[in-house]
Amino acid sequence: MPSFDIVSEVDFVEVRNAVDNSARELKTRFDFKNVEASITFDKEIVKITTESDFQLTQLVSILRGNLAKREVDAQSMTQKDTVRTGKAWACNVEFKQGIESDTAKKVVKTIKDAKLKVQASIQGEKVRVTAKKRDDLQAAMALVRNNEELGQPFQFDNFRD
């Protein structure tokens, strides 16, 4: 029986490249001239520090743009609380890796509510979808890909015929 897995993974090599491009852009931007600002990547977390809240927002926007250029979905990015220490503002940006159980249940429920002739089952941090026909699997892929309510980007992996 044909099957595929629904996963949610972020390519951290591309994230590192986007952070490096953002740091390069930070050095050339006029509005960041003579300003203590930095953007670093360390163990799946991007740390952003600046002198003001507005500049922090600008740096996050630069990062989002560079992530989009590197084809990393911005929905996988979650910005943590902004912290002010002395005259510096800082925030951490984390990336969703894997499908949480609540989201996996929503995916399975969405597929079952569509009344497609497929079976969806949760297997750890991925959802396996099986069917008798390849066309049914492709319909399930389109359904999950176009569903905005799930709030997380998905990739389709391990397609077997």
Swiss-Prot record:
Protein's UniProt keywords contain Transmembrane helix: no
Protein species of origin: Photobacterium profundum (strain SS9)
Function comment: Nucleotide-binding protein.
Any GO MF annotation of the entry: nucleotide binding
Entry protein name: Nucleotide-binding protein PBPRA2024
GO cellular component, one term: cytosol
Family: Belongs to the YajQ family.
Pfam entry (one): DUF520
PANTHER family, sorted: UPF0234 PROTEIN YAJQ
Keywords: Nucleotide-binding
Nuclease found in the keyword field: no
